[in-house]
Regions:
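Thiamine diphosphate
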Residues: 1-168
Length: 168
């Protein structure tokens, strides 16, 4: 089989997801214009428009809050946080609001937000942190997924789009 960059696998999978799910959208720092920092969304803003594939400011807590609001209203948002190191800025909102919505409302409300990020590069001093142990404890009520490769990541997105529960 031909070798393909991981970004191409993700881009093609997101393309199929946006085609299949009209309520799916993705937003975050650099998602739209450049197609995310690794070009995993390359060309999708042009194809699906600025509402479904959009850029945001550098405010992780706001990105998470926007995602919760969109999910509560029946959309299927994917909120991108550029690097796992930055997830800590949104942890309070994820822990108190997102992760507990189904439980607190006895299943009457759902916020199936997917929080997309990348990490575990384990090189250099920037973007290489791994708060995973803390996330597992702090985000009870959310799926926390760490794919081994981009094919598995694509499969996770496909499965999560059918779920009513939030995930990181």
């Amino acid at each position: 089989p031909e070798m393909v960059d991981g970004r191409v696998i993700l881009r093609d999978n997101f393309d199929k997801l946006f085609d299949k799910y009209s309520k799916a959208l993705i937003f975050g720092e650099d998602c739209g214009t450049i197609g995310d920092v690794n070009q995993g969304l390359e060309g999708l803003q042009k194809k699906y428009g600025e509402i479904r594939v959009s850029d945001t400011g550098i405010r992780e807590a706001t990105i998470i809050g926007q995602g919760i609001g969109l999910a509560l209203r029946g959309l299927r948002p994917i909120a991108e946080i550029q690097y796992l190191d930055y997830i800590l800025y949104g942890i309070q909102t994820m822990s108190d609001d997102l992760a507990t919505t189904l439980y607190r409302t006895v299943g009457k409300q759902k916020a199936p937000l997917i929080v997309r990020t990348r990490g575990h590069r384990l090189e250099g001093i920037w973007h290489s942190g791994s708060p995973m142990g803390g996330l597992i404890h702090l985000l009870r009520g959310m799926y926390i997924l760490v794919p081994r490769d981009m094919t598995k990541a694509a499969g996770f997105y496909n499965t999560l789009m059918k779920s009513d529960e939030p995930a990181l």
